[in-house]
Design a protein with these regions (language model features):
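Extracytoplasmic thiol/disulfide redox context detector
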Residues: 2-99, 169, 173
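Cysteine-centric redox/oxidoreductase cores and disulfide-bonded domains
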Residues: 93-179, 184
Length: 185
């Protein structure tokens, strides 16, 4: 249990440093964290299915400018986490465009191209100003980045991808998130 507490303390301090660089000075002493002001305790706790690991769930949306800015920092930070701590991205799903973007995330994961296409989707929306609100727009983006259109279509229509999108929606509702990016530890 001591290892988990030490990992959690390191995680809290690191998240504070990351957010501090984005949002300005933040006190990092643990006794200055106030429930309801700096964080919320989820009741009941949200299960993440990772055993004894410390899981940082990142709720994001490809259309969110703050998520676009935060993603490179979170990715770099996630690579430095100690054993037993992981970052688990989870697309937020509140409406049809977000559902389409969540499908893009899980299609990339199923096809084994998530590491490559995750930043590409963000760039397409925020740099190239693409909406990516339709199957065709997503398929074209994936095809432009080396994905076979037939494989894309198969994944798009799959029960597995639809199931993952539904699970992401349920996870965000359980966590009671009200905006993106949001983190749950």
């Amino acid at each position: 249990m001591t290892g988990i507490r030490q990992t959690f303390t390191t995680l809290v301090l690191t998240l504070t440093a990351v957010f501090g660089s984005v949002t300005g000075p933040v006190a990092i002493a643990e006794d200055r964290w106030t429930e309801g002001q700096h964080y919320q305790t989820l009741t009941p706790p949200v299960a993440v299915g990772r055993g004894s690991d410390v899981v940082v769930t990142e709720f994001f949306w490809y259309g969110c400018g703050h998520c676009y800015t935060f993603e490179p920092m979170l990715t770099a930070w996630g690579k430095q986490l100690p054993d037993g701590a992981v970052v688990q991205p989870s697309p937020a799903v509140w409406n049809d465009p977000m559902r389409m973007h969540a499908k893009a995330y899980y299609i990339a994961e199923v096809l084994g191209v998530k590491e490559t296409l995750h930043p590409v989707v963000f760039d397409a929306m925020h740099v190239q100003r693409k909406r990516l609100a339709s199957r065709l727009e997503l398929r074209d983006l994936f095809e432009d980045n080396g994905v076979d259109p037939a494989q894309f279509n198969k994944a798009f229509d799959s029960f597995g991808v639809d199931s993952q999108v539904r699970q992401a929606d349920a996870r965000a509702r359980s966590a009671k998130i009200s905006g993106t990016p949001s983190l749950m530890v």
